[in-house]
Amino acid sequence: MTIEQIAKIANTTLNDENSKVFTALKPQIESWLNSDLFMGGGSKKFSKLYPPLLNPEQIDYYSSDPALCWILNLPLPNTFDFIVFGSHAASLHSAVPAFMGICGVYNICFGRDTINPKQSQNFASQNTNRQNYIDIFKALLQTKQIKDKFGYKKCYLQLSDFLLDDDVAKFYALLPQKDALLVTRDPISALKAMCHVQNRPQFMLLGGELFGAGVNFSISAKDYFDKNLKYTNKFTNDKYKPKVASDKELFSDLPSINDEKIKWWLLDRAQSFHDGQVFALLKERLLRVKIKLTSDFVNAKETMRDLSEFFGFDYNESPLFCERVSDLKYFTPLKIYTNENMPFFDEINEPLSNSTEIDAQERMRISKEQAKSSIILHLSSVFDKRVYISKNRGKIASGEITEYFDGIEKHFVVFLENPTLRTQFLANQTLLNKAQKYILLASHDIYKKAQNEKTKHLKESDILDFLAKNTELRALCAAVFNVHLSFLREYKPEIIETFKHYNHFAKLCVNDEQIEFCDEYKIEREKMSKIGLDKLWL
């Protein structure tokens, strides 16, 4: 067997990297590919399109190089219990992980919203499905340790980004066969949520500098969020590069709808609407699929009970299943640098938001110097994963100190970033008193602002009215939605019938003629056709 033949079986093109691997491991590869297990029924659980070149059951994943495993088409480590997938704005970054966490189910998620901001400036151009495989591979090797350390009973892998590169089919083919949950939503409702998305304050510049995505006693939480929590008018390729909130081209105090923003979400590299694409690539790896709507996670007690029975995790009765998780999504966890020598913001004559740029920079410089000797607290929501850890492994292990903060708004909890500093922090009465005063004010100010922000949200009718006046954009939406909904259209058309706003949108498109799509869409369609997804178009 030649290395060219091995490459053909592996469904890959020979290059310097894999040629060396195939040559070095040629005897082992030949032995496996000629074995009865590979040639017979034992290979059914492996991908037909990207079969493994070594027996996965004989691989010690914990001592293996993920990049080498990728070349050899080895499935990801089988250390998780089920898969959750769906598109953006479907609650996969809010209600689903929060409610799963309450039931002792831990999630592993890789995507653009989970990366380290300090390393993310060039994320849009650097992230690939190969890198996703490597990152997830490493994370999956930690699941047993996480379960043992924090008391989680189950773990799921969340697939909420769909990166359309040359390796996308291979990435999904290398997942172990599992049951899965698809969370889906009326696409017009999803687009509405995308159009009033807020920026993340940790990517904003305050006083000319990025202050560790947090605040200190000299900066009130109200001032911080009033200045930095804005609505995005447009997106750029350097989305994760810190920006100034006063840039009116990028940000505003109210959500907006415009052509550029909608096109960005429709043609974003992570494919915001991708249920159909992911299912088409993933279906060979799925054993059973449970489908839930985003609306099922409103007053979600019965939803969580149903999911617990389907996936075999423990159902924990909780009043939090009736709460909205996303209200505090962009506010928490808030990092607070506590230092007893920092002046309190109400002792300063002028709030930071009204100060000059020079003064703001100077105050930030002083604050950052003092922060070096600070004890960092996190003001977080009751849906923080560490709440579960507190209940199962104790407050000392999780760093929770909420009990020392009387009167704070009930939707908040307080943690030490470093739990080992608990005794030192609580023994410093001056520091504790200042922190108590600060967090009492911050919790109520933040909750009040969060409720006020909800009143600014767009409605589905706003999106429909905008699309009714824009034929080209409407046609682009229709084309993207057709692919996105292809799985439901084939297997669960009754769900599409419940999408009231999408069906209204479809009526707007009845008399639309075929139009020439923008170049960006042609490129995306060509990419999908190359990996066999052209059949998803009507």
Cite the ranges covered by each PLM segment:
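Phenylalanine-focused residue identity feature
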Residues: F22, F38, F46, F80-F85, ...
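PAPS-dependent sulfotransferase catalytic domain
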Residues: P27, F38-P319, K329-I358, R363-G394, I401
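PAPS-dependent sulfotransferases, especially Golgi type II membrane carbohydrate sulfotransferases
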Residues: M1-P75, D314-L538
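C-terminal or late-domain output modules
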Residues: D113-G151, A169-L181, P201, F211, ...
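Intrinsic low-complexity, intrinsically disordered segments enriched in polar/basic residues
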Residues: Y106-C109, Q131, D238, P242, ...
